């Protein structure tokens, strides 16, 4: 990761951008691979088939509490894709796959501008309603139209002797360019369970795109992370 700088709304950000405290809820859905591929064809990337004819879409809510981009909420639609040049399949391939970010609504203008400018993230302004209980629920809307709502039931704690650091990558597409975003994550307070999350789609155009995937109402796997630290480096152009 470099120490380059970017000026966003008069504020100088020195790379890597640091997120010191966040929490995340995520739901993993199994969808037809051909539908997922149609959704991301514009990126030039290939979805990862973890089973014959099946791909993975993750829907997540992240609450950024303390970081260089400020305090905000973020909803992500992430399609798991193979690294460029790979056509690997199966569960092992899924372990090597990365998230292509197709939707990324947020509720603060600074992170919107930074995300678009530095990494090509497809951020739009949206409204969030969160009920922090068990079950944990949230709705995300834009312009008065519901995109999605998800209800999460608490998962089982995953034991860890110490917070683990993971080196990851994410792909974005903006203005005809596909980029790879390197980032590192350190987390603790992890919970997972089979199922455990129920999806409700609205009438927003994003919701219609999600419906085109044949998303089931119930997730294959869901989870939460109570404490997340992240660093994001500069994006690299792929094509």
Task: Name these PLM-found stretches.
Residues 2-11, 107-239:
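Interaction-surface and assembly-scaffold signal
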Residues 8-12, 20-26, 45-163:
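Structured soluble/peripheral alpha/beta segments that form catalytic or ligand/cofactor-binding pockets
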């Amino acid at each position: 990761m470099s120490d380059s700088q970017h000026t966003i709304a008069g504020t100088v950000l020195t790379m890597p951008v640091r997120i010191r405290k966040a929490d995340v809820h995520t739901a993993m859905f199994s969808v037809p691979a051909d539908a997922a591929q149609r959704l991301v064809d514009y990126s030039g990337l290939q979805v990862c088939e973890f089973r014959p004819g099946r791909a993975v879409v993750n829907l997540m809510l992240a609450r950024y509490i303390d970081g260089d981009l400020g305090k905000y909420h973020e909803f992500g639609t992430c399609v798991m894709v193979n690294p460029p040049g790979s056509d690997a399949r199966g569960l092992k391939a899924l372990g090597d796959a990365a998230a292509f970010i197709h939707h990324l609504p947020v509720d603060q203008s600074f992170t919107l501008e930074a995300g678009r400018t530095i990494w090509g993230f497809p951020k739009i302004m949206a409204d969030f309603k969160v009920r922090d209980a068990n079950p944990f629920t949230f709705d995300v809307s834009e312009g008065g139209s519901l995109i999605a709502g998800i209800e999460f039931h608490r998962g089982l704690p995953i034991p860890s002797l110490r917070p683990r650091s993971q080196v990851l990558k994410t792909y974005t597409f903006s203005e005809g360019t596909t980029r790879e975003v390197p980032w590192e994550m350190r987390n603790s307070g992890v919970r997972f369970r089979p199922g455990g999350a129920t999806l409700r789609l609205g009438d927003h155009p994003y919701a219609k795109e999600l419906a085109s995937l044949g998303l089931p109402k119930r997730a294959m796997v869901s989870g939460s992370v109570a404490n997340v630290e992240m660093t994001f480096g500069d994006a690299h152009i792929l094509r």
